[in-house]
């Protein structure tokens, strides 16, 4: 299940949801951190994006969810917009720095900050996932694998079986 409450909610309410889920045998799989842009070109939006992602990761850890999930962000106006600067070496480095800031600021005990693939953002392939994970170098950073988001060419479409096998083998 996804997390039914928002970050910033009362810790007693979080504890009640955590207990209710456990008692019912329900795993709270994720806390969505979508809508936040931790690599925004606007410094205020970037700082807000990082802070909000940290709050979501804290909630995930407190409610015993597996992860807080988001895309890496965009160099455009929106949090997940297409932009020519999204797939550059400088943006890759900025993603590494922002994810480190998110996870190092929270130091979660259980949950991970999981990055989801997108066709026009890093990670846009399994290999770029591996490159990011290696560069970020934090156990509290994880994978939220949505293979539909990397089926972006006729070759990948017609060979999705091989794509999936390769993805699971590598990840």
Each language-model region and where it sits:
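Active-site acidic/histidine proton-transfer and metal-coordination neighborhood
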Residues: 20-23, 38-143
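Glycoside hydrolase catalytic-domain groove-lining segments
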Residues: 137, 154-171
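Hydrophobic residues within beta-strands of alpha/beta enzymes
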Residues: 1, 29-31, 68, 113
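Structural motif corresponding to alpha-helix initiation and N-cap regions
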Residues: 10-15, 43, 54, 123-126, ...
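Short, solvent-exposed loop/turn segments at secondary-structure boundaries
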Residues: 5-9, 40-45, 81-83, 154-159
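Active-site beta-loop-alpha junctions enriched in small/polar residues
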Residues: 1-4, 33-36, 73-74, 116-120, ...
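Aromatic-lined substrate-binding rim segments of carbohydrate-active enzymes
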Residues: 8-25, 32
């Amino acid at each position: 299940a996804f997390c039914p409450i928002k970050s910033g909610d009362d810790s007693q309410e979080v504890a009640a949801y955590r207990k209710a889920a456990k008692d019912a045998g329900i795993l709270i799989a994720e806390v969505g951190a979508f809508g936040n842009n931790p690599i925004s070109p606007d410094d205020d939006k970037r700082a807000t994006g990082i802070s909000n992602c940290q709050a979501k990761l804290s909630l995930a850890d407190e409610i015993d969810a597996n992860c807080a999930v988001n895309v890496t962000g965009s160099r455009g106006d929106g949090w997940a917009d297409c932009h020519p600067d999204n797939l550059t070496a400088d943006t890759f480095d900025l993603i590494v720095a922002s994810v480190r800031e998110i996870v190092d600021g929270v130091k979660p005990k259980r949950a991970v900050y999981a990055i989801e693939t997108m066709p026009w953002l890093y990670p846009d392939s399994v290999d770029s996932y591996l490159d990011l994970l290696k560069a970020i170098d934090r156990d509290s950073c994880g994978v939220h694998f949505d293979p539909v988001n990397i089926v972006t060419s006729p070759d990948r479409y017609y060979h999705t079986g091989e794509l999936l096998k390769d993805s699971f083998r590598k990840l």
